[in-house]
Amino acid sequence: MEASAQALNAGFVMRMTRGLPLLRSKIAMSLDGRTALHNGASQWITGGAARRDGHHWRARSCAVLTGIGTVLADDAQLSVREVATTRQPLRVVLDSTLKLPLDARILQGGNLLIYTASRDVQKIAAVENAGAQVAVFAAANGKVDLRACVQDLAARGCNEILVEAGQRLNGALLQQGLVDELLLYLAPQLLGDMARGMAQLGELTSLEQRIELAWQDVRQFGGDLRIHASVKRR
């Protein structure tokens, strides 16, 4: 009973004990692990049933997080649309230099938080006037401080975060040990070695550097498979 309760409230337990929310990365990809063509085209790799399941995970999450690259490429909204919901999750964009266009669809409807490393007062004011909240967390490399952002989301009361991002942000979050679970939607297709991968992890020189996973669940949605896995902690 206790284990079942902890599983149902894993995000809350993690936030109370670690000061971090449960971070779950959702990635749609081909069977050879590719998430988009070399030119960025990715709509749609998976079918409608898999996408609807993805909206269920959006609906249960406190926040949906992405990078500015995904917003610029797809004009992403990050809202729950394909399933019934009583609330919309907080939408979070990591945008180190505040490149967000002021006519981006994600600015519609409010409930949007932008994390940036920029201290440009005019840019911040413009984004805030367009309806978003802006928080500055800069790392030493001039990019957004990922751990500080995730800790801030925990401080805002977020228990579960769904990440829907590209290979660079997916890789950075994994490398910093911030990802707890993966939702991998596999489509029965091959996109080739020039297509973009699921996570940019750089070169590993030893198997000791690998990120190990534990299987949680495998299900089929239409013609696609969903693999639910957790990241093993060393």
Protein language model features and the residues they cover:
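Enzymes that bind and transform nitrogen-containing heteroaromatic metabolites
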Residues: 3, 7-15, 21-234
